């Protein structure tokens, strides 16, 4: 999770540690900035990859992106489960639906492209997001010349739901990469 530390400091907000605190922080942000949507995600090229990052902290699963299975493995019971039919998944959807209905979640979070999402964060229209940690430097480096107080920072995950735990699941992973051979004749190019 990433958050605007400068805005939290300005409003005297603490990092939330559970679902209720998370909700209350969003409400306080909305009260202070009525035209904002305090929580924003980006669509990850039209996928629902946010669910892969969100579901495990609720004690459920969404989709294995490596082979497109909607199953999760429960290490405690030793059984596979179909995440989207679990009570925890329903609880998660109900929570985000509540945020959506109350204007606490960016309305186009499932379709907004990366540029639009960047603009929402940079313009101060949203203050909490879920993305790669490298985005901290991306936002701080690009925003501080015009707003020296702008501070995007890491926010430890809150425990969500009755079965949730404070964790960041291994869902944001690269499945490919680029390499340059040390034997190339154009190594210095």
Language-model-derived ranges and their functions:
Residues 1-189:
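Extracytoplasmic/secretory soluble proteins
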């Amino acid at each position: 999770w990433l958050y605007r530390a400068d805005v939290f400091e300005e409003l005297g907000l603490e990092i939330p540690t559970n679902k209720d605190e998370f909700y209350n922080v969003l409400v306080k942000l909305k009260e202070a900035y009525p035209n904002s949507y305090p929580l924003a995600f980006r669509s990850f090229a039209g996928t629902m990859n946010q669910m892969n990052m969100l579901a495990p902290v609720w004690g459920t699963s969404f989709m294995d992106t490596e082979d497109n299975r909607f199953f999760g493995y429960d290490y405690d019971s030793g059984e596979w489960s179909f995440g989207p039919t679990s009570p925890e998944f329903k609880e998660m959807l109900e929570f985000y639906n509540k945020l959506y209905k109350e204007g606490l979640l960016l309305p186009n979070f499932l379709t907004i492209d990366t540029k639009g999402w960047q603009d929402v964060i940079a313009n101060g229209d949203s203050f909490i997001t879920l993305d790669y940690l490298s985005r901290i430097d991306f936002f701080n480096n690009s925003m501080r010349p015009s707003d020296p107080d702008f501070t995007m920072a890491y926010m430890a995950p809150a425990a969500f739901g009755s079965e949730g735990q404070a964790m960041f699941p291994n869902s944001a992973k690269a499945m490919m990469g680029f390499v340059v051979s040390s034997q190339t004749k154009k190594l210095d190019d």
